[in-house]
């Protein structure tokens, strides 16, 4: 009966512990290990059959967007020459991405027009990652592949459009195939590899890099958190302390990874944009 109850609610990882409060080691119940079921959610509204529903990740994505817009609106709605604390924090974040990522990768003159896109991507990705360690939410939206895929698609379309606009069809062809006549007889093979790398592998890896890191990080956090509770019985208590310490350590590490992955995502975005504007020789 206990196993059936756990299976019934396992779609929501935030409910695992709540429905297994009397399940500890040596009690005869199995360890409620995290898995793919930890990333599946029942609709908060609607149903899966109709493909029209609203679930927890969607809610977090919406709330995250509102938080970001609200933060910058509050910081810049009445900008001051001598900035207050909120404006100072917002300016520091904005300026870090503008100067440290966009200007350094694309250049000041060409990059200025892409600052809004890159800043928006950075803070959105970062916020979606941060949900993983925020109480009650405790789920990184970017651990669901659809979200990184859409963001990567936006960058991909921007890159293709910009390449066509700046270099024309011939320039686009040379750009995506890495055309270099000095390669001689291996040129056809090199062009084929480069074509698949740019057209298929590039957007795939751009999305999967973010998704895989958030998926793995959340799984580890769930594992140590659940283990801390599960081991609270008999001699297992000693190991529960170790698991709890690992939960704290992994949370701190995950906080670093969340910011790093947001940074890497926009850094690659700027690299692709810069490559689209660079004339291929």
Curated annotation (Swiss-Prot):
Q: Does the keyword Aminoacyl-tRNA synthetase apply?
A: no
Entry's InterPro entries? ATP_synth_F0_asu, ATP_synth_F0_asu_AS, ATP_synth_F0_asu_bact/mt, F0_ATP_A_sf
Q: What is its main location?
A: membrane
- Record keyword Transmembrane helix present: yes
MF annotations from Gene Ontology: proton-transporting ATP synthase activity, rotational mechanism
Task: List keywords of the entry alphabetically.
Answer: ATP synthesis, Cell membrane, CF(0), Hydrogen ion transport, Ion transport, Membrane, Transmembrane, Transmembrane helix, Transport
> According to its record, what are the GO cellular component terms?
plasma membrane; proton-transporting ATP synthase complex
Locate the transmembrane regions by residue number: 56-76, 117-137, 144-164, 181-201, 215-235, 237-257, 259-279
Where's it found, cell-wise? Cell membrane
Which residue pairs form cystines in this protein? none
Alphabetized Pfam families for the sequence = ATP-synt_A
Entry membrane topology: Multi-pass membrane protein
What PANTHER family is this protein classified in? ATP SYNTHASE SUBUNIT A
What quaternary arrangement does the UniProt entry report? F-type ATPases have 2 components, CF(1) - the catalytic core - and CF(0) - the membrane proton channel. CF(1) has five subunits: alpha(3), beta(3), gamma(1), delta(1), epsilon(1). CF(0) has three main subunits: a(1), b(2) and c(9-12). The alpha and beta chains form an alternating ring which encloses part of the gamma chain. CF(1) is attached to CF(0) by a central stalk formed by the gamma and epsilon chains, while a peripheral stalk is formed by the delta and b chains.
Biological role: Key component of the proton channel; it plays a direct role in the translocation of protons across the membrane.
What does the similarity note say?
Belongs to the ATPase A chain family.
Q: What is this protein called?
A: ATP synthase subunit a
């Amino acid at each position: 009966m206990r196993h059936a109850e756990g299976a019934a609610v396992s779609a929501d990882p935030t409910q695992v512990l709540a429905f297994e409060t009397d399940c500890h080691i040596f009690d005869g119940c199995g360890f409620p290990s995290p898995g793919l079921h930890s990333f599946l959610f029942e609709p908060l509204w609607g149903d899966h059959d109709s493909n029209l529903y609203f679930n927890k990740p969607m809610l977090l994505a919406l709330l995250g967007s509102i938080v970001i817009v609200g933060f910058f609106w509050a910081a810049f709605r009445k900008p001051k020459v001598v900035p207050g604390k909120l404006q100072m924090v917002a300016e520091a974040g904005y300026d870090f991405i503008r100067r440290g990522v966009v200007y350094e990768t694309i250049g000041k003159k060409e990059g200025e027009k892409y600052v809004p896109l890159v800043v928006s991507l950075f803070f959105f990705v970062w916020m979606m990652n941060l949900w993983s360690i925020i109480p009650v939410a405790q789920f990184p939206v970017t651990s669901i592949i659809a979200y990184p895929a859409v963001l990567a698609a936006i960058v991909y379309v921007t890159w293709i459009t910009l390449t066509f606009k700046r270099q024309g069809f011939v320039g686009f062809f040379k750009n995506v195939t890495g055309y270099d006549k000095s390669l001689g007889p291996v040129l056809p093979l090199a062009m084929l590899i480069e074509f698949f790398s740019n057209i298929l592998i590039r957007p795939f890896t751009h999305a999967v890099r973010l998704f895989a890191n958030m998926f793995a990080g959340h799984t580890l956090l769930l594992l140590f958190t659940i283990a801390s509770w599960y081991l609270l019985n008999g001699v297992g208590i000693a190991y529960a302390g170790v698991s709890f310490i690992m939960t704290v350590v992994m949370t701190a590490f995950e906080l670093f990874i969340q910011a790093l992955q947001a940074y890497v995502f926009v850094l690659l975005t700027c690299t692709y944009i810069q490559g689209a504007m660079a004339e291929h020789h």
